[in-house]
Amino acid sequence: MVHKNYLSALAIFLTFALFSLQHFTTQPPSPKGLDTPENEFSAVRAHNILKSLLIENKPHPVGSDLNRTIKERLKDELDKLGIQHQEQKTWACATRFASCAEVENLIAIIPGETKSPYLALMAHYDSVPMAPGAGDDGAGVVAILEAARALKLEAPFKHPIMIILTDAEEIGLVGAEAFFNQHPLAKEIGIVLNIEGSGSSGSSMVLRTSKKNELLIKSYVHETARPYGFSFVKEIFKRMPNDTDFSVVNRSNIAGIDFAFAGERNHYHTPNDTVDNIDLRTIQHHGENILPLSKNLASVDWDDMGDEFIYGGEIYGFWTQWKTSYSLIFSLLATLLLMLAIFKSKVSVKKSAVGILMSPIIVSTTVLSGFIAFYLLSFLSGKVISWPGIEWPYRILLISSTALGGLIGVSIARKFVNQIEMLFGAWLFWLILTFLITIYLPDAANTFILPVIFAGFLLLISSFVKEDNKQILFLLTLVMSVPMTLGLIFSLEQSQGYKLIGAVLPLVGLYALIISPLLFSLKIKLINLCIGLVTISALLIGSYTNLYTEDRPQHVNIYFYEDLDAGNSYVQLSSQESLIEPLVSYINEEKAKALVPFSGEYLSENWTQSASSEWQGPSLEKQIELGENKLVKLKLNSNRSASRIVLLLPKDSGLTSFYLGSVKMKPVLSSWGLYEGYYVIYLNGIYNKEVELKLNFDANKSEVSAYLMDISTKLPSHLDELYKDRSGIFSPVHRGDQAILIKKISI
C-alpha cells in the first residue's frame, strides 16, 4: 500500500533511481590490458598503436607530409600483422559539393575460404587541420588494427576480410568516394562495418544501418556483450548536416553498420582531440562491437539480409528489436490493453478525454519553461554554451526550469480531472503520438511503443487489484518511460550540447506528462516558489560566471582575408558564441561588412582592418582549346604552400564539367553562404603540388571572370599576438584558422 501523501515523493525517488540505473548500464566497458588473451580485444594494445601513430600530437589533414608519414606507419603496422596491403592513389571529389583531393587510401586483405564477397572494416586516417584526430578517427583505425590482429589468428573464415583505411574523409568523404566509385574491389564487398568518432569519450553505438538489417542486428546482439544503439538515431541523422563514410556505402547499396561515439564533443575537431584525452573505455567498446561481430559475419551466409528491423538498447541492460512492419501491430496491441483497462477500471471516458486535452498543456508548459529559461540565459549573458566547462549551472537550470513548467501544467490539469482520469488521459495521448510516430518516423516507433504497452499492461492489472495496491502499479508505469525519455538526455547533452536544447526539452516534456498524475497531491505553490528561486540562482550563475575552461574552451577561429587586387585586408574572429576578453579588444568595428570582393551580400561581424600579409598569391597558367566545346587547361600553384586552392566561377560561366587527372566531375552550384551563386571547385591537400585542372565550357562562351584563392591555416606574422591570446580558454575548431588570399582572373 502506498499512501497518496507519499506517492509523489516515491515517484520522484524512483525517477532518480531508474535514471541512474539506465545511465550506469549504458556506460562503455572497462578497458582490457596487455595480459588479455591474444584472441580478445585489448584497448591498451590498441591505444599503444595510437600513441605510435600520432606521436607528434599534431593535425594531419589530407595531402600533408604528416598524413603521409602516418600512412607509412599504418603500412608498418599491417606488415607486423602479416596482412598484405595495397594503396589507391587517385583524384576524387565529394558528391554534395566539388571538394576534391588526390587521396591515398590503404586496402588490406585477410584471405578467406572463398574469394568474395568481402566483409570490410573501414575507418579514416586523416584529420581536420586543427585536431590531432585521436578520437576522429584514430580510435576507429586502431580498433580495426587490434581487431585485425585477433581475426588473423583465427583466419581463414568463410568470407575474406578487407580493411579500408580511407583518406580525406574530413573534406567530404572523398577517400570513400574514390574507393567505392573507382576501385575494382568495391564491387566485391558484401558488408561494411564503418567505425567513426566524434569527441573523445562515450559508448560506441550503432549510429545507423543499411535498410535491410535483420541479419546484421541479430548477429550484433547475439555476439556482442554490450550492444548499444537506438534506431531512432537514424531519424535524427537523416535531418542533420553531419556525415560519415557510411553514406558512400549506402549510396553504393552495400549492407552494413555505422558505429560511432559522441562524448565530450567540445573536443571534436579541436586541438584537444589528443591521444591523452581519448577514453580507453570507448576504444574497448569499439573493439567489443566489431571483433565478435566480424567473426560471426565472416562465418555465415549473406544470401538473405532479412527484413528491416528497429531496435533499442540497452534498456537497463536489455536489448529490444522487431521487424519494422510489426510496429503497427504492437501499437494496436497497446490500444487493446488501454481500452480493456479503461473498461475494467470503469473510469469516465469523458473525463479521460479531458485528460487527453490536458496532456499537451503539461508537455507545453514544461517545454516552454525550459525554452524561456535558456532564452533568458542567452539574453543575460549573450550566449548559450554548447558544452560549458562548468556544467552544473546549466544542468540545474534545465532540471529546475522544466520542473517548474511541469508543475504549472499539473496545477492546471488537476482543476479539471482527478489522478486516475489524468493517468489514462496521459497514456491515451501517448498512444496517439505512438501511431503518428509509427507512420511518419518508423525508425523511432519503438521509443513510444514499449512504454505504452508496458503501461497498458500495468493499468489493466490494476483494475483487478485492491484500491490500496493500485498506486504501486501506477508508480511502475515509470519503469519503461524513464529510459525512453530522461534516459536519452545525457547522450543528447553530450552529442548535441545546450545550444540545441530543443532536442532535449520534448523528452523532458513527455516524461513530465507521464509522471504528472503521480504529483497531484503536491502543494505546488510552495514547491514552485522554491524551484523558482533555484531557477533564478542557476540563471544568474550561468549568465555571469565564466564557464569556459582549458579542457572545454570557447571555439574561436581567426580568419584573415586579403584582396590582392584592391589591396584590402581584414581580420575576423569567428565564433558561435559572443566573444570575451581579451579577444574582443582586437575588434573595433561594430557594423557587419562584406569582407570578400565576390559577395557583397554576405556580411561578417567581429572584424577589423589589417595590414597586408606581403604574401604572393596563387599562380595560374592557362591554355584554351576551342572546338565543339571550350576547353581550358589550368596549371595551379600556391606560392606559399597553402593547403587549399579554390576556384570560383559565376553561374553564367557556362561550366559543364571539369577533369582532375582522368576523373571527370560535374560542377556544383553553391546555393547559400559565402559562395552563393558560384560554381566552387575546392582543391585540397595542395601544399607544394602543381595541379592540372581541365574545365569544359559551352562553346559559345567567351572569356569569363572568376576568382582564385589559396587558403592556409598559417596566419601572417603580424597576427602573432592575437594568435597567442587565442589560447588557454580559447581554441580553434573544424577547419580552424584561415588565411585567404583572393585575386580576380579571366578564363
Task: Locate predicted features.
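Extracytosolic and intramembrane catalytic regions of membrane-associated proteins
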Residues: 68, 72-109, 141-142, 219-222, ...
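Alpha-helical transmembrane segments of integral membrane proteins
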Residues: 17, 336-619
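Transmembrane signal-anchor helices characteristic of membrane glycosylation enzymes that use polyprenol
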Residues: 15-29
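N-terminal Sec-pathway targeting helices
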Residues: 1-12, 524-530
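Juxtamembrane/start-of-transmembrane alpha-helix segments at the extracytoplasmic/lumenal side
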Residues: 313-332, 388-395
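Alpha-helical transmembrane segments of integral membrane proteins, especially early/N-terminal helices
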Residues: 251, 287-295, 325-328, 357-365
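Soluble extramembrane regions of membrane proteins in the secretory/endomembrane system
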Residues: 28-320, 672-680, 684-698
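A broad structural signal for short, well-ordered beta-strand segments within beta-sheet-rich domains
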Residues: 114, 189, 480-481, 642, ...
